[in-house]
A protein has these predicted regions:
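Hydrophobic membrane-insertion alpha-helices, especially the h-region
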Residues: 5-21
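The canonical Cys-X-X-Cys-His
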Residues: 44-56, 111, 133
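Surface-exposed patches in mature extracellular/periplasmic domains of secreted proteins
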Residues: 55-60, 144-146
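Extracytoplasmic electron-transfer domains, predominantly the class I c-type cytochrome c fold
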Residues: 69-119
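C-terminal capping alpha-helices of c-type cytochrome domains
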Residues: 109-110, 117-145
Length: 146
């Protein structure tokens, strides 16, 4: 067997073996979703909820290692940073901070991340949609800061 053949066999064995490493793809119970106008709710669900809620639509590739490890990690990190399904768990100051950070990241084009938009065309936001989300964040910050 040639070196190339051995390397190919080792790579295949590694990929097959990686499938045996379990990952936990969960959608915990929803505590209370964020209340937003219908237009904003639709944008949030389309572009944010897969990582920032407990309503993740797990794609087929979330079942194939090593990509599954990255997807699960991103969802867990997203929920830690901002979980729209646990909105009531945040006090007013936390909500204002999370909304401020969200508005900044949306304005800078950091959210949704480029690699998510690459495989989720529906998560690509137009300039008008970004502005609508930023305006809603600003209005919510004002509302919760009273």
């Amino acid at each position: 067997m040639t070196r190339l053949g051995i390397a190919a066999f080792a790579l295949i064995a590694l990929v097959v073996g990686a499938q045996l490493v379990p990952v936990t793809r969960t959608n915990p119970a929803i505590k209370a979703d964020v209340a937003a106008p219908a237009e904003i709710d639709a944008l949030l669900r389309r572009a944010c909820y897969d990582c920032h809620s407990r309503e993740t639509a797990w794609p087929w590739y979330s079942r194939v290692a090593p990509v599954s490890w990255l997807v699960v990690h991103d969802v867990e990190e997203g929920r830690r940073e901002l979980d729209f399904s646990a909105w009531d768990a945040y006090d007013a100051a936390q909500r204002a901070k999370k909304l401020r950070e969200s508005a900044d990241e949306i304005a800078e084009g950091e959210m949704p991340p480029w690699y998510y938009r690459l495989v989720h065309a529906d998560a690509r936001l137009t300039a008008a949609e970004r502005e609508a989300l930023r305006a809603w964040c600003g209005a919510e910050i004002a509302r919760v800061s009273r």
